[in-house]
Swiss-Prot record:
Amino acids binding glycine: 236
Membership in a protein family: Belongs to the THI4 family.
Enzyme kind, highest EC tier: transferase
Reactions this protein catalyses: hydrogen sulfide + glycine + NAD(+) = ADP-5-ethyl-4-methylthiazole-2-carboxylate + nicotinamide + 3 H2O + H(+)
Presence of the UniProt keyword Transferase in the record: yes
Cofactor entry: Fe(2+)
UniProt GO molecular function: iron ion binding; pentosyltransferase activity
Key words of the record: Iron, Metal-binding, NAD, Thiamine biosynthesis, Transferase
Pfam families: Thi4
Family matches, as SUPFAM superfamilies: FAD/NAD(P)-binding domain
Role noted for this protein: Involved in the biosynthesis of the thiazole moiety of thiamine. Catalyzes the conversion of NAD and glycine to adenosine diphosphate 5-(2-hydroxyethyl)-4-methylthiazole-2-carboxylate (ADT), an adenylated thiazole intermediate, using free sulfide as a source of sulfur.
Name used for this protein in its record: Thiamine thiazole synthase
Binding site for NAD(+): 40, 59-60, 67, 133, 159-161, 179, 226
Length: 261
């Protein structure tokens, strides 16, 4: 269909600035900030938002999904096991049975983060990309929010002061680096927090330890996903993701209990 499109430059700029300002004013105070939009973070966001919790996901890259997109060594599939498959099915993700392995399923490594992200957004969560958490708000021995910066500014090495977001709870789902907990430990050595990092691969051990390691490790700060195993020196798992999704769900449930939702 041919037609005349209206594309006034000033109107475009005004629209972006106005809507962005309104968005930021609404996000300065939230219930939960999730740092890292990988598999566990997106899952936690979905379950929190479904219960009406004001949830904000901050992802440093321009796309969410973490390491899911690349599947296993670039092969575009991931593996998920029972009962975590139900989490993906609830987001409308198609799964394929594995011959001879009744507990295992494969899923498209592009479809999974795309649909899980949409499920979180549709539930009411807000996802912001290109934002890095460089510090935490620590008041009276409790985490009360995050200190954020543009990832582009950080990468450029520019000296620009950050801004803050207030939150009742913060989730570190940044993955292997456990960057939020590591920042807390580095800047507040008197707290005695250490991040030993994950061990080498042992898929079954790593998967089964994820939900056990998902917990509040400091007042107001939760760990889930690979951050939980990095903090507790658990094993890595590779391209099997069931534990990640179950960890995200458990983290949401723990916070919902705190919020009495």
């Amino acid at each position: 269909m041919d037609g005349k499109l209206r594309a006034d430059e000033v109107a475009v700029t005004k629209s972006i600035i106005k809507s962005s300002f309104e968005m930021w004013m609404d996000l300065i105070e939230v219930d939960v900030v999730i740092v890292g939009g990988g598999p566990s973070g997106l899952t936690a966001a979905k379950y929190l938002a479904e219960k009406g919790v004001k949830t904000l996901v901050l992802e440093r890259h321009l796309s969410f999904g973490g390491g899911t997109w690349g599947g296993g060594m670039g092969f575009p599939n991931i593996v998920v096991e029972k009962p975590a498959d139900e989490i993906l099915r609830s987001a409308g993700i198609k799964l394929k049975s594995v011959d001879g392995e009744p507990e295992l399923f494969t899923a498209d490594s592009v479809e999974v983060p795309a649909k899980l992200g949409v499920a979180a957004i549709d539930a009411g969560a807000k996802i912001l990309t290109g934002i890095v958490v460089e510090d935490l708000i620590l008041k009276e021995d409790k985490i009360s929010g995050v200190v954020i910066q543009s990832y582009s500014i950080e990468k450029a090495g520019l000296h620009v002061d950050p801004i803050t977001i207030s939150a009742k709870y913060v989730i570190d789902s940044t993955g292997h680096d456990a960057s939020v907990v590591s920042t807390l430990a580095r800047k507040n050595k008197d707290l005695g927090i250490e991040v030993p990092g994950e061990k080498s691969m042992w898929a079954e051990k790593g998967e089964n330890s994820l939900t056990r390691n998902t917990r509040e490790i400091f007042p107001g700060l939760f760990v889930c996903g690979m951050t939980a195993n990095a903090y507790h020196a658990g094993y890595r798992m590779g391209a099997i993701f069931g534990g990640m999704y179950l960890s995200g769900k458990k983290c949401a449930e723990l916070i919902l209990e705190k919020l009495n939702k």
